[in-house]
Amino acid sequence: MDSSKRQFLQQLGVLTAGASLVPLAQAKFSFSPERHGGSTQQRYAMLVDLRRCIGCQACTVSCAIENQTPQGEFRTHVNQYQVQVADKVTNVLLPRLCNHCDNPPCVPVCPVQATFQREDGIVVVDNTRCVGCAYCVQACPYDARFINHETQTADKCTFCVHRLEAGLLPACVESCVGGARIIGDIRDPQSRISQLIHTHHDAIKVLKPENNTAPHVFYLGLDEAFVTPLMGRAQPALWQEV
């Protein structure tokens, strides 16, 4: 960590040492922060069709290679959960990533405005500004953020924005064996994602809707147990050593 970031954290600690804690819901944060980058004509979102996901972790591996995340740290992964409904216990595969919310709670808590939302809805981190305080990590209700132990800055899925801007698909979408991940512009009614959302409107779900974050990762075939606060206990990923 460079000296300017270290000095900022020291000053932040002095300022907050004697401060009273205020619940986030009562804090005077703006949940409509200024957006920049991207185009207002687009709104990127992802649809995950769980009927097609086989848990192969190709998305996890390709993302790690594309974005060069440190070993053991991932921007996306597929968790396996056991869910009990009545007397029946089933295993459920659930791909997890940043939800690129319309009301992202990670943005207003950043003391240096390193986390921001682009005009096209993609939430990104400016690593040149991030001081690694981890406020955004704690604020994210989806556990989609982590502090990269190599860069000492916040890290997360960006929908591979560098690839989107080059006319390419995100690494996870391109590598998905079952074609379970679909990304596109939901402001374009002719886009594949828009048509799928329209066709399966009643079956489309999001994680933790009670948080009112307006997530833009949609799930098709999601078990009802995951719509309410996450139930079921995460098992080790199938490809990891335990």
Each language-model region and where it sits:
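Non-ligating segments of multi-cofactor redox enzymes
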Residues: 1-242
